[in-house]
Structure formats: structure tokens, C-alpha cells
A protein has these predicted regions:
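Short catalytic-loop micro-motif centered on adjacent basic/acidic residues
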Residues: 25-28, 54-56, 155-157
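Metallo-beta-lactamase
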Residues: 31-33, 97-99, 136, 146-238
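Active-site HxH/HxHxD metal-binding segment of metal-dependent hydrolases
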Residues: 31-35, 42-148
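Beta-strand-turn-beta hairpins that frame and shape the catalytic cleft
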Residues: 1, 17-24, 129-154, 170-175
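Short Gly/Pro-enriched turn/cap motifs at secondary-structure boundaries
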Residues: 5-7, 121, 157-159
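Conserved beta-strand hairpin/beta-sheet module of binuclear metal-dependent hydrolase folds
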Residues: 1-48, 168-179
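Short loop/turn motifs at secondary-structure junctions
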Residues: 22, 51-52, 213
Length: 238
């Protein structure tokens, strides 16, 4: 079962996704000292004897990447993966991107968080599975069962909220990690930097074609665990 921890600015749904035994991957760690929850994810992992194999970013907005410095300090060997079109939002170029966004949101007090954003270690490539994405970045999971579990998670490039937004889908377990693309009763904003109404529409059509409507949805904010068909029932009203 996917565990959800609300972290960082705006209470991002940080996801701990089990693979096999103690192994898992972490999606959108947002915990940071300025938000008073910098140890929320690392404590959860250690208290449950979990071993993260990757930090996965559904996109590069400041509220979803705030926890990267803390996570990399605790687990320096664990790779960070993001779509190449959002890659410049972290690493050396990340501070400039994030500073502009948080200033526009009136959150300049958070700027310190983004001074040491780690670089991306690999790309989340559309149509690939997480095992292949890790392998291409030079990382070996080191556990055959965990590797097989990673192969079940496929990457869907879903631009619209940002150019590098992605979703993750496990067809076997019918779990769908939607980032800020699909929410309960809403779709992602397109009025921020890198957003696009037309690309969002295309991405929602792609999700409709690709993902079972019985899949349980884990978005980047708010309610988790609803069936995808509930979103498309809502969407049909427009």
C-alpha cells in the first residue's frame, strides 16, 4: 500500500511506494526546515526500516522539490529522477527558477531551501519503466525482486501543468500517481510558468486512453485513493 505524508509548502502528498521487502521509492519529497517538517520523510523511512531506491519528481515546481536537500543529505547515494524538460528547475540552475516562483507566490522566506538543490541523476522518459530509467542513470537496485517491481511502474509524460510533468502507472496493481495533472474533481493549473491549456487537454486524453478507469489515483495534493473514473465523470461535465 502506498503511504502518504503531507509535507512542505501547500501540504504536498509525498508518496512512499513499496516495491519488495524494505525497498521503496519516494515521490515528491517536500519536507523542509522552513516548514517545520524536515525530518518527516526520513523519520518515517527509518522507523519502518525502509530503503529508498529513488527520489522521483512528478515535476519541478518549488512545492514538490523542497525536500530534496534533506533527502540527499540522509541518502546521498539515492538518485533523483525528473523529466528532462523540468530538469533545469533543480541543481545549479534551480535556485534562479525557484526564487522567481516563490517570490511571485509571496513566499520569499523559503528561498534558503533552494540554494542547494541536488542535480538530477537521470531522466523519466515517456514510455519507459522505472527500472530502465534507473538503469540508464547508472543505478543498480541491487535486489532482483525490487527490480521486477520497478519494471511494473511506467512513466507517462503529461505536459500541461509544466513542460516536464509526468505521471506513473502500475497496470498490475491499478495505481496511478498523477502529480499535479489529475486531482479529485479538478485538473492541474495551466496558468503558471511552463503551463499550457492545449497540452493539458492532450495529456488528459492520453491518460484516458492509457490508464484503466478503475485505477486508484494518488495526486500531488489533497484527496488520494479515488478511482480514475470519478475524475473522468467530473470532466465529462465540461
Amino acid at each position: 500500500m502506498i503511504s502518504v505524508i503531507h509535507t512542505g509548502p501547500y501540504g504536498v502528498n509525498t508518496l512512499i511506494v513499496p516495491l519488495s521487502g524494505p525497498y521503496d521509492f519516494v515521490v515528491d519529497p517536500a519536507c523542509c526546515s522552513q516548514c517545520g517538517d524536515e525530518r518527516a520523510v526520513t523519520s518515517f523511512l527509518k522507523n519502518n526500516s525502509y530503503i529508498p531506491l529513488a527520489f522521483i519528481l512528478t515535476h519541478g515546481h518549488y512545492d514538490h522539490v523542497a525536500g530534496l536537500p534533506v533527502m540527499k543529505e540522509a541518502y546521498p547515494e539515492v538518485p533523483v529522477l525528473i523529466h528532462e524538460k523540468d530538469r533545469e528547475r533543480i541543481g545549479k540552475s534551480g535556485f534562479d527558477f525557484q526564487s522567481a516562483d516563490i517570490a511571485a507566490a509571496g513566499l520569499s522566506s523559503l528561498a534558503e531551501v533552494y540554494k542547494n538543490l541536488p542535480e538530477s541523476d537521470g531522466n523519466l522518459t515517456d514510455g519507459s519503466n522505472l527500472y530502465d530509467c534507473l538503469k540508464e542513470s547508472g543505478v543498480n537496485a541491487g535486489n532482483a525482486e525490487a527490480e521486477e517491481a520497478l519494471k511494473k511502474w511506467s512513466v507517462l509524460w503529461t505536459p500541461g501543468h509544466t513542460m516536464g510533468s509526468v505521471c506513473l502507472y502500475n497496470e498490475e496493481s491499478e495505481e496511478f500517481i498523477s502529480g499535479d495533472t489529475v486531482f479529485y474533481g479538478a485538473w492541474g493549473r495551466t496558468d503558471l510558468a511552463g503551463g499550457s491549456d492545449s497540452l493539458m487537454a492532450d495529456s488528459l486524453k492520453k491518460i484516458y486512453r492509457t490508464v484503466k478507469d478503475s485505477a486508484l489515483v494518488y495526486p500531488g495534493h489533497d484527496y488520494c485513493g479515488f478511482e480514475l473514473k470519478e475524475f473522468f465523470t467530473f470532466l465529462s461535465r465540461f
